[in-house]
């Protein structure tokens, strides 16, 4: 027997106390009071670890309850056969149809799948970009000892009416040479690639700040002007703007390639 199992060895050799079961029952009954006391009185690191442990226990408990309820829903009720001669009670008349709870659960799952499919993109995951790679520190001031300015090293979109702030107030600089106005957009169903103007940056997966700055990186969702494609809605109206996802690295290729989200 391993050396660390000396307690098990002692129990096998001498048995347990005569009041072991009673002491165990009382200890389990007091457990709730002990947990309540610790939750109210613990402070510092021990309180953090206690809260973390309790959170994990509650999550596991809720998961187990949800699985149990799901198994109840999935169980089909026994159908009533009117030929048996037993009259069905009034409160069970609406249960002759299939289980409504199961049908409702299935419809909700189907809607979730449709929603996920609707918003699915060609590139669901992209590589993270650090701030050191995104921004370059610019030295300013008479002695070049101030370093509060940053220059974006990636391609950006700034829009038509963009005006730079005064030099003394501009903290983040977007170079003119790295600004993009158009993108090579590919229609996945038609199989054509068109040079379309960019209307705006919808979402950059790296950070909300990069979305606000209009940074164009791989996986960014942009809005493009698709009026040249002649797309129309079911009501006969011309589609003006549509979303597309960037599939290349604009700072490496020097251009923006995107796939239209249809």
Curated annotation (Swiss-Prot):
Keywords: Nucleus, Ribonucleoprotein, Ribosome biogenesis, rRNA processing. CDD domains: NSA2. A motif (Nuclear localization signal 2) lies at residues 51-58. A motif (Nuclear localization signal 1) lies at residues 11-18. PANTHER family: RIBOSOME BIOGENESIS PROTEIN NSA2 HOMOLOG. Component of the pre-66S ribosomal particle. Interacts with NOP7 and RRP1. Interacts with RSA4 (via WD repeats). This is Ribosome biogenesis protein NSA2. It comes from Yarrowia lipolytica (strain CLIB 122 / E 150). The lineage of its organism: Eukaryota, Fungi, Dikarya, Ascomycota, Saccharomycotina.
């Amino acid at each position: 027997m391993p050396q660390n199992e000396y307690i098990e060895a002692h129990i096998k050799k001498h048995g347990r106390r005569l009041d072991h079961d009673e002491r165990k029952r009382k200890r389990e009954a007091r457990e709730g009071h002990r947990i309540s006391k610790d939750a109210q009185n613990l402070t510092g690191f021990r309180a953090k670890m206690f809260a973390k442990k309790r959170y994990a226990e509650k999550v596991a408990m809720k998961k187990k309850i949800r699985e149990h309820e799901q198994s109840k829903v999935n169980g089909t009720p026994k159908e009533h056969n009117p030929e048996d001669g037993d009259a069905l009670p009034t409160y069970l008349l609406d249960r002759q149809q299939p289980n409504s709870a199961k049908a409702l659960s299935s419809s909700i799952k189907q809607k979730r799948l449709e929603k996920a499919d609707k918003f699915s993109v060609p590139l669901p995951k992209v590589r993270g970009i650090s701030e050191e790679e995104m921004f370059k520190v610019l030295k300013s001031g008479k002695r070049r000892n101030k370093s509060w300015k940053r220059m974006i090293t990636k391609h950006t979109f700034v829009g038509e009416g963009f005006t730079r702030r005064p030099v003394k107030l501009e903290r983040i600089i977007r170079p003119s040479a790295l600004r993009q106005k158009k993108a090579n957009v590919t229609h996945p169903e038609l199989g054509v690639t068109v040079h379309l103007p960019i209307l705006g940056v919808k979402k950059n997966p790296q950070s909300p700040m990069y979305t606000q700055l209009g940074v164009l990186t791989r996986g960014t969702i942009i809005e493009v002007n698709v009026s040249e494609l002649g797309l129309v809605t079911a009501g006969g109206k011309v589609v003006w703007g549509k979303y597309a996802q960037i599939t290349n690295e604009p700072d490496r290729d020097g251009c923006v390639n995107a796939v239209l989200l249809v």
